Amino acid sequence: MLVMSITFSFVAVALLVYFYVKVRTSFSPDAYAKTMQQEVIKMIRDIRYEADIAVQMLEKKIGECNQVVRTIDRKLTLLNEEILKEHTARTLFRASGAGQETREEVCARPEHRSAPSRAGSSAAKPTPTKRGTIEVYNEKIIRDNGLRAESPLLKDAIIALSEKGLAPEFIAEKTGKPLGEVQLLINLSR
């Protein structure tokens, strides 16, 4: 029995030493540092993973924004070309004097022979000279059919811009036409 108690004593001392070393290493500053280092490494991995996902999403959004910018740039280029064409056409139209007639030409038409003074204003009437039954005026007038003389070109430009997907408000702003007139032209073209 003595042997057994000595054996148990050695086992107890061995267990005591083992648990002492185990507790001392588990709660030592080195153990805390090692545990913290492992947690920091794990957090760094998580942050890198989340950052990679965020960068991929950001790159995707940047690509979409670049596509939208290219589309807008293409539409603005087309719009500038159309505005330049419309401005050139308007300038040529005004320079050629098209759309203007003298009162002599208007009064020479059969439908205007009976009432030559209808087109004149009451403020300052030019003096007519008689040539048979046609009164000749030297003042120039512009035919007015409800729309301006340049409206066929402008109408085509408005319709083309609306077919390209531009908003009626934007078209009205850029062409100088009222919004209602632009919307009417767009709706009539459909």
UniProtKB/Swiss-Prot annotation:
Positions of transmembrane segments: 1-21
Compartment(s) of residence: Membrane
Region Disordered, annotated ranges: 103-130
Biased composition (Basic and acidic residues): 103-114
Domain of life: Bacteria
Residue runs in coiled coils: none
Membrane topology: Single-pass membrane protein
Keyword list, A-Z: Membrane, Transmembrane, Transmembrane helix
GO CC entries: membrane
Family assignment from sequence similarity: To B.burgdorferi BB0265.
Protein's recorded name: Uncharacterized protein TP_0711
Species name: Treponema pallidum (strain Nichols)
